[in-house]
Amino acid sequence: MAEPKRTQVVTTESMNRNFLDEYNSRDAILKYSTKTAGQGVNYLIRHDYASIYDQAVDLCRATSDRPLRVLEFGCGAGMNLIGLVSRLQQRGIPLERAWGTDFSASLIESASAEAQAFLPDASRKTVSFHVARNERLSADLSASTDRAPEELTGSFDFVFGVNTFRYCHRLHNAPDCAKDIYRLLRPGGVVVMIDMNDRFPLFRSRLKRSVEAPQEAYLPSLKEYAEPFESAGFEITARNHFCWIPHSAGHRLTAICRALTPILNATIRSRAMRSLVVARKPA
């Protein structure tokens, strides 16, 4: 009985090393930085994702009118958080702080540079980026910000993560991440999770499975994405599939995918590229 357990630990450590090597690389920085990322992700941040964030922020503000405190976990080079901060400014919604976390120090450094380059001075003062692992979000955030865990508990209004929660499932620590998010959110606070849909044909392809180890290629179902949040005590307010635009798409492919979206949504929405879970901590 002990032998399989030891093998699993080695596999998990190996996967952690692989992920860290990948997301500390120059390619990762280019992939997740505004100027060098695909047109697809830049479009989504300004439109599809922005609409989701708008609704989540409005849900937060229904129970509190204080200036927002926002956290993005697995923020990469900061594109989503910077986009959200710009969106809040456009909407005239006051922001007290917006923090981004990632386990890659290289991406955190890049995110800080992105904020300097793309945010005005007033907004930039509210934004900071910190090294923290998803599975130890509360503890690592406490250490990196030099704030006691008790000070962070219940201190955020809105938490979100894009294309990061699947790694928690692959490493079997999704419940730990969801519990930490629950702990960090105030009552009435909202979490948004966006990630890859296991039903999208390309993500299920034999070719993809043949070049990746089974555990590294694993994608959760929509039900599996939602379960850790439900178990942590959240109320699920939305769960669905959406988005037909690849993050890496250029201008032409983005335009084609946008044109096809209404037809695809009407016929095969469950096969869309992204899974969405929106959950609220009971007030």
PLM segments and residue spans:
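Conserved beta-strand signature within the Rossmann-like core of class I S-adenosyl-L-methionine
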Residues: G188-D195
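A conserved beta-strand element that flanks and buttresses the S-adenosyl-L-methionine
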Residues: F160
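Class I SAM-dependent methyltransferase SAM/SAH-binding core
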Residues: M79-D140
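Class I SAM-dependent methyltransferase "Motif I" SAM/SAH-binding loop
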Residues: G74-G78
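Acceptor-substrate binding/catalytic loop of class I
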Residues: C168, K208-E224
